UniProtKB/Swiss-Prot annotation:
Cofactor (UniProt): Mn(2+); Mg(2+)
NCBIfam families noted in UniProt: archin_ph_syn
Principal localisation: membrane
Protein name from the UniProt record: Archaetidylinositol phosphate synthase
Amino acid sequence: MLSKIRPKVKQPLERIGKTLASLGITPNQLTIIGFLITLLASYEFYLQNQILAGIILAVGAFLDALDGALARATGKVSKFGGFLDSTIDRLSDASILFGIALGGLVRWDVTFLTLIGSYMVSYSRCRAELAGSGTLAIGIAERGERIIIIFIASLFNAVKIGVYLVAILSWITFIQRVYEAKKRLEMG
């Protein structure tokens, strides 16, 4: 769903990307910095500091949104950069949920189902696109939406509700993608 507003925020993000480029920061460095900040958010979730964790998570997610803009601003768009960003996103998702579970904020089984659902959203898109479906950026809970849900829930010390919501929406999104991929791939 957030992918629909991406064109509206592209230009402001690219202006910030140009500023970061003038500081000598590379897109891959920004990806790693964002991940390290996300690890700090995970640690704060472990300590049950939900509000602080949510704020730190938002900073890490914002930097994650900037790495692509920085790559475009510097002409450093690369296949490896896309691979690194996507891979680090999966590690970030796991670390956040791990911190939440380790802190006792959500049961492990719910955390596991949430993580698998989140991974299946990403994996189903990747596999469908490799099979020739075209871009499959559909569904009610892509990664951006999932991060926003956890962020907002954290601000209200309600991360448990946020994780349950992410779990449900991730599985719905996965099913939406399977259905859409089937439709597209059987047509082509």
